[in-house]
Amino acid sequence: MRNLINFAVLIMTIFIVSASGARETRMMEQTCPVFWPMVPCDANKCEQMCRDYYGSVPSYCNRIGTPIAECACSLTPC
């Protein structure tokens, strides 16, 4: 019985820590543009993806014409 209680406390602790880490990551994402890999980068698809994930925010294609092209969603200026 004691092991079961310890196991339950461990699972709850892991859940709480992981939830706070995810919240902190989302807060960090809101400080600069968020980059999504998109090869080739299509401006319309980039704009739609940013709108779907973050609402009405500016978007642009970064590193156009390279194998590491990205769609950037500008949440706030850095």
UniProtKB/Swiss-Prot annotation:
Belongs to the DEFL family. It is found in: Secreted. GO terms for cellular component: extracellular region. Residues 1-22 form the signal peptide. Disulfide bonds join C32-C78, C41-C61, C46-C71, C50-C73. It comes from the Eukaryota. Keywords: Antimicrobial, Disulfide bond, Fungicide, Plant defense, Secreted, Signal. GO terms for biological process: defense response to fungus; killing of cells of another organism. This is Defensin-like protein 201. Its main location: secreted.
